[in-house]
Amino acid sequence: MSGFGGVKNVVVVGLGMTGLSVVKHLLRQPEALTIKVIDTRDTPPGHDQLPENVELHSGGWQQDWLINADLIVTNPGIALASPQLKPAIDKGIQIVGDIELFAWAVNAPVIAITGSNGKSTVTDLTGEMAKAAGVKTAVGGNIGFAALDLLEQDAELYVLELSSFQLETTSTLKLKAAAFLNLSEDHMDRYQGMADYRQAKLRIFDHAEVCIVNRDDKQTYPDVEKTLKSFGFDQGDYGCIEKDGIEYLAKDAMSLLAANELGLVGKHNIANSLVAIALLDAVGINLDATLDTLRTYNGLTHRCQVVADNNGIRWVNDSKATNVASTLAALSGLQLEGKLHLLVGGVGKGADFSELSPALHDLNLMMYCFGEDGDQFVSLDPRSLLCETMDEAVATLYPTLNKGDMVMLSPACASFDQYANFMARGDAFTQLAKQYSIES
């Protein structure tokens, strides 16, 4: 089934921003649908925004609703392997996510991005470049606006960030172009292993006209024959060339702009810029109209963002680094004059933090480890200190700061042990940075 034909009873599992967008979308359908919402939280966010004709069951599951539904729409945070969904699956009830509903409804070109790291930056950058070329563009999915809310914008192009969780429940999304940026260990508390995680990511290519893959990460290549374009740091479809000692971003070995002109810093952002170029090229957007955006784009909040710079001490908010690979990328691009004071920790999601050791060894640093899994970092480097909270860590490091030092939050962990999300964690760090910068 692809659509609402024959559907009368719909159960939405999980409220919040995504769940509310699903409810609003269902209410807009011409079919007379009975909509019910299940949320295991006692007071789920958005409960007060539900219309009276949408019944809510909170504080647990409601099996009768699930097994009598014609269609179940789950929040990305709900795994299909959840035992509470098994009776409905055994009964043959279709379970989809919000992106599948988006696929049924969208009537303009869509491009999408997935990967373990960098997908938010690539999604936002691609959207900004398309807008600069005069294309009415809507950006969202796993970033910013929920995908279904974007449909109200009547865009000419949709640019979506898609997580592996969203892709699990997406089957019919047709894409003009799709990019799989990279694959590194993440969400091992959800998946049986890396192969399982990779298969979820690869679903982005199922109905893509052009598949954009990473030449430096063969795990991003589809297992079946597809139309491929690749990006990387060598020459290729989209890559880098050197002329007169200057590195350039290039398409088919033809230079587009110098790497040192990019508004974003760090080697990983050269790759991110190449992906954005490849995606827009795939949908026929004139690249000349987009290159100025690459020169001026400074990135997203909570991603290697300098939030304070006072007395020669920089405070960098990289709260979006919720896994080891993200923190490694942040460390690889650093320009340090003094010592790095690195804040790590939170919920490790079963990750192997030992991959950080070589990068830490090469840096002049002190590492402050906090949160639920902070103790797992201490053994990585003798220059480590265990703290209960980020506040305690900053209070401890502050008296030791000298001109040229950098304080960086790049936790390599999820935030939900002490914060609502990575944004709240980043905001808390930013507040601390500004507070201590004033005092210094």
Curated annotation (Swiss-Prot):
<dbReference type="InterPro" id="IPR036615">
    <property type="entry name" value="Mur_ligase_C_dom_sf"/>
</dbReference>
<dbReference type="Pfam" id="PF02875">
    <property type="entry name" value="Mur_ligase_C"/>
</dbReference>
<comment type="pathway">
    <text>Cell wall biogenesis; peptidoglycan biosynthesis.</text>
</comment>
<dbReference type="Pfam" id="PF08245">
    <property type="entry name" value="Mur_ligase_M"/>
</dbReference>
<keyword id="KW-0573">Peptidoglycan synthesis</keyword>
<comment type="similarity">
    <text>Belongs to the MurCDEF family.</text>
</comment>
<feature type="binding site">
    <location>
        <begin position="115"/>
        <end position="121"/>
    </location>
    <ligand>
        <name>ATP</name>
    </ligand>
</feature>
<dbReference type="GO" id="GO:0008360">
    <property type="term" value="P:regulation of cell shape"/>
</dbReference>
<keyword id="KW-0133">Cell shape</keyword>
<keyword id="KW-0547">Nucleotide-binding</keyword>
<dbReference type="Pfam" id="PF21799">
    <property type="entry name" value="MurD-like_N"/>
</dbReference>
<dbReference type="GO" id="GO:0009252">
    <property type="term" value="P:peptidoglycan biosynthetic process"/>
</dbReference>
<dbReference type="InterPro" id="IPR036565">
    <property type="entry name" value="Mur-like_cat_sf"/>
</dbReference>
<keyword id="KW-0436">Ligase</keyword>
<dbReference type="InterPro" id="IPR005762">
    <property type="entry name" value="MurD"/>
</dbReference>
<dbReference type="GO" id="GO:0005737">
    <property type="term" value="C:cytoplasm"/>
</dbReference>
<dbReference type="GO" id="GO:0008764">
    <property type="term" value="F:UDP-N-acetylmuramoylalanine-D-glutamate ligase activity"/>
</dbReference>
<dbReference type="GO" id="GO:0051301">
    <property type="term" value="P:cell division"/>
</dbReference>
<dbReference type="GO" id="GO:0005524">
    <property type="term" value="F:ATP binding"/>
</dbReference>
<keyword id="KW-0131">Cell cycle</keyword>
<keyword id="KW-0067">ATP-binding</keyword>
<dbReference type="InterPro" id="IPR004101">
    <property type="entry name" value="Mur_ligase_C"/>
</dbReference>
<dbReference type="InterPro" id="IPR013221">
    <property type="entry name" value="Mur_ligase_cen"/>
</dbReference>
<dbReference type="GO" id="GO:0071555">
    <property type="term" value="P:cell wall organization"/>
</dbReference>
<protein>
    <recommendedName>
        <fullName>UDP-N-acetylmuramoylalanine--D-glutamate ligase</fullName>
        <ecNumber>6.3.2.9</ecNumber>
    </recommendedName>
</protein>
<keyword id="KW-0963">Cytoplasm</keyword>
<keyword id="KW-0132">Cell division</keyword>
<keyword id="KW-0961">Cell wall biogenesis/degradation</keyword>
<comment type="function">
    <text>Cell wall formation. Catalyzes the addition of glutamate to the nucleotide precursor UDP-N-acetylmuramoyl-L-alanine (UMA).</text>
</comment>
